[in-house]
């Protein structure tokens, strides 16, 4: 019997252990990265970035109909189950206004990344339409290559380059656009040194030496920014006030619980009408996202039922 992964959203497709035989049929490259655990069970060599990439290719093809997916070396290779959880919890949040998950929701992904992971999952699971913003031209090119290589995605996902240094929504949300929600996986660290130290910790935890290849890739804009996660989300909160009537829910992942109090204070300062925290768990890993809106219940109901 398959063991369940604790804490995943009920609609998440990844509750059971990976069916490696099936995934290897979907992506034969994965076979070379299989290992045996001390208990004699087949697993994937998660310390090898090529193995993680091969696993992701198989998962995205098998569960989300993304037949062609790849990312350049050095970019983050995201764990698919955790990313799917954010999408499913976001769907529940959008459902509270009308009682059903909107089938034609318009979502803005801040920092879509080279992997384009949130739009790929959201389009398949709910038929949503996505706009993805990105500061890195290389990441944008990679995401566009994924979209172009998979039939139907061009109609559902559009990308925009953030050209304004330090801006988040400004320059991305156009004057007459409306979004049901924004989502974001913000840069975690406050400096390159802190990002390196974080990778070093993960390396030690996996028993790797410094020369071992890592699954902890990531470009500067993916891993760190001035002031770290709190400052980034605070900036997002400040800018969100200017788009209060164009966006129903603003949301962002928050990596550490201790980062929440200053964010709650910032949300009070800008006059957020409602703030929600959604806790998530994947195995031992705890995470959460916060959501805020400047619309009351009636305004949100009207927003969901608007002409599109």
Swiss-Prot record:
Keywords of this entry: Cytoplasm, Methyltransferase, rRNA processing, S-adenosyl-L-methionine, Transferase
Membrane spanning residue stretches: none
GO biological process: rRNA base methylation
Gene3D superfamilies in the record: Vaccinia Virus protein VP39
Major place of residence: cytoplasm
Keyword Cytoplasm (UniProt): yes
Family per record: Belongs to the methyltransferase superfamily. METTL16/RlmF family.
Chain's role: Specifically methylates the adenine in position 1618 of 23S rRNA.
Protein name (database record): Ribosomal RNA large subunit methyltransferase F
Organism, as annotated: Shigella flexneri
């Amino acid at each position: 019997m398959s063991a369940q992964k604790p804490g995943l959203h009920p609609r998440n497709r990844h509750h059971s252990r990976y069916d490696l035989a099936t995934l290897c049929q979907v992506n034969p490259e994965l076979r070379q990265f299989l290992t045996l655990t001390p208990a004699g069970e087949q697993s994937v060599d998660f310390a090898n970035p090529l193995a993680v990439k091969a696993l992701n290719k198989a998962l995205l093809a098998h569960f989300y109909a993304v037949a062609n997916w790849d990312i350049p070396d050095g970019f983050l290779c995201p764990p698919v189950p955790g990313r799917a959880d954010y999408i499913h919890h976001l769907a529940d949040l959008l459902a509270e206004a009308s009682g059903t998950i909107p089938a034609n929701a318009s979502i803005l992904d801040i920092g879509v990344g080279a992997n384009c992971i949130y739009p790929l999952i959201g389009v398949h699971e709910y038929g949503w339409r996505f706009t993805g913003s990105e500061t890195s031209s290389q990441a944008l090119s990679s995401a566009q290559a994924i979209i172009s290589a998979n039939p139907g995605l061009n109609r559902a996902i559009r990308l925009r380059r953030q050209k304004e240094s330090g801006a988040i929504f400004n320059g991305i949300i156009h004057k007459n656009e409306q979004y049901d929600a924004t989502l974001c996986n913000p840069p975690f660290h406050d400096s390159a040194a802190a990002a390196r130290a974080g990778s070093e910790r993960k390396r030690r935890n996996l028993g790797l030496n410094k020369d071992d290849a890592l699954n902890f890739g990531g470009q500067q804009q993916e891993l760190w920014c001035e002031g770290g996660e709190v400052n980034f989300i605070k900036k997002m909160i400040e800018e969100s006030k200017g788009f209060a009537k164009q966006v129903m829910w603003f949301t962002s992942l928050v990596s550490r619980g201790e980062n929440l109090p200053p964010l709650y204070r910032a949300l009070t300062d800008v006059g957020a009408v409602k703030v929600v925290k959604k806790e998530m768990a994947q195995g031992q890993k705890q995470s959460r996202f916060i959501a805020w809106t400047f619309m009351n219940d009636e305004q949100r109901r009207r927003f969901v039922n608007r002409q599109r």
